Amino acid sequence: MASRATSLFIFFFLISCTFMLLETNASKNKSRSDLPLCGFREHCDGLWCPGEGGKYSCINWSCNFIEDCEKRIRCEKTGPCCFDGLCDCTNF
């Protein structure tokens, strides 16, 4: 009898932990529309992004993984990528 009660306790404990974990991660997700919309421009070795006052400038953001770029920017045509240690918006 104790093993059934223990099994039920562990089952419901895991269910509640899973729910709390999912709820915590969902609240940390930012809206993609809050990220700057960057693009590709010739003669710019980085990203062409809006800065202060809406003026665009060439910006370089370092990265190790594509997720680093996805947390910082949006791209006009395709998703951002991490290329040679820098975030980039490809022109495809």
Curated annotation (Swiss-Prot):
Which superkingdom does the taxonomy of this entry point to?
A: Eukaryota
Q: List the disulfide bonds.
A: C63-C82, C69-C87, C75-C89
GO biological process entries:
defense response to fungus; killing of cells of another organism
Q: Where in the cell is it found?
A: Secreted
According to the record, the signal peptide region is 1-26
**Got a GO cellular component term for this one?**
extracellular region
* Alphabetized UniProt keyword annotations: Antimicrobial, Disulfide bond, Fungicide, Plant defense, Secreted, Signal
The Swiss-Prot or TrEMBL record describes its family as follows: Belongs to the DEFL family.
Task: List the protein's name.
Answer: Defensin-like protein 294
Q: Which organism is it from?
A: Arabidopsis thaliana
Name the lineage: Eukaryota, Viridiplantae, Streptophyta, Embryophyta, Tracheophyta
